[in-house]
Amino acid sequence: MVELPFQQSQALNVRQNRALALAGVFQATQLTHMTAMTGQQSIGESGNFYFELLIKASLNIRPTTNNNTVQTLDFFNQLADISLGLKTLENCITQPFSNAPKSRLPKMRSAKLPMSYAMSLLQLEKKVYSNPEYVAIIEKAQQKILKQLSFFDNNYLHPSILANLAQTYVDTAGQINPRILVRGNAEAFKDTNHTNRIRACLFTGLQMAHLWRQLGGSSWNMIFSKRKLLQDIQALARLQYQVI
């Protein structure tokens, strides 16, 4: 038996495509959580790898798209690029949940915070993209950053790029209440570069949330159809390798 890496040419079904976009949201919120809790700008080689891929995708996700033809993998190279998000999403929906009334968050902080941020981003995305002014800000920022990259040797993690992504988040989602309150190293939050990185992470999550909604994603469906979502995640995990 030989395992071959997943081939991008293999099409995903509608639910899998949508689940993968949602995993992108959770990849962003997991990176947000990791950055905030460690209090360090660097989240390791693998963390930076996943973060850079999210930034690339977020700069190419447009306000409108043909949801009949778009695939989440159009914005990534392969399923492995979103493996952190798939694992985070799976952990969040399989962890024991709080017994508190109206609570739909896991008990464990390692799952609770990324899911809390993700749920907030899904709500914020709808408000941001229903406001033409915010949409225009995002489109203008995307064009500006894509041009800037040539000056920074296509370094998506350059402080100036992260600062622009962070400012775009502040100028859009950051203007809407309730704002996302990120928990982490209080001392590190005094560092502008650190907060820029966190806000840049949140911006990529906002963009992935927009793609998810374009693909037919619904917050209510995510909450009340966890079994189907888990099936889709597990199917995507198996698709990372083709067995012959």
From Swiss-Prot:
NCBIfam families per the UniProt record, alphabetical: PRK00218.1-6 (NF001250)
User: What is one cellular component GO term in this UniProt entry?
Assistant: cytoplasm
InterPro entries per the UniProt record, alphabetical: HflD (IPR007451), HflD-like_sf (IPR035932)
Put simply, this protein is called High frequency lysogenization protein HflD homolog
Provide the alphabetized UniProt keywords: Cell inner membrane, Cell membrane, Cytoplasm, Membrane
Please give, as recorded in its UniProt entry, the membrane topology of this protein.
Peripheral membrane protein
The entry assigns this protein to a family as follows: Belongs to the HflD family.
Checking Pfam families in the record gives: DUF489
Compartmental location: Cytoplasm; Cell inner membrane
Where is this chain primarily localised? cytoplasm
Superkingdom: Bacteria
